Amino acid sequence: MPENSSNEAASLANIEKSFGGGPDSMVHVLKGSTLTACMGEMLLLIGPSGCGKTTLLSILCGTLKPDAGQATLFGRKLQEMKDSEITKYRGQNIGFVFQQFNLIPTLTLAENVAVPLLINGFSTRNAERMACEALARVGLGDRTRTKPGKLSGGQQQRVAIARALVHSPRLIVCDEPTSALDKETGAQIMDFLREIANDDQRAVIIVTHDPRIYKYADRIAEMEDGRILQETTGKTAIAEKYLSVPH
């Protein structure tokens, strides 16, 4: 955990989570995991498949409740909130970027980016204006009327990032944002995400198996068997520990 938590975006303290139908079939996925994400930093969550990364992130975002421990998002304890409150709070404060772009092929880029705004009650006019501004932010301001099928993979991921940013969330959560991209395009996406974290002073959390992007992190949290094994902070320490990983 970072020494300075005054700029804390989200925290998980001693989180436990099991799945199964009874004592004999219980699978203990999280075993006392603790993690903190801060504003202005890019945090990478790494570890082998099945170690609990997705479950941990689901609890941090309020889409899953822990069996024990405390989840806090921007100062609010999620366990003390009603499901409807969590849904609204998550929608206001978190933007999501996934491995699959999930763009609607029949809609223009602006219409795709505007979808979450329209769902949350924004007028069509305001949603379109905000969508165009978000697309300009990711370098696609001249493609607002283009359909997704005419874009490269990297450009489609930029649209997905614009959609995540359109409502100005304080936390961006990314699940394998570069795995479907080539090295050069992935580097461009990571440069942009780091800019969002460091320059815009947002919190960015990335779940990844891609060692090529470790160098972009301000901090790396390594998970194994339902626990956070260790955290590495600082570019030098990250480079020494992780950048020698074969890839």
List PLM regions with ranges.
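Conserved beta-strand-loop-alpha-helix hinge in the C-terminal portion
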Residues: 219, 227-247
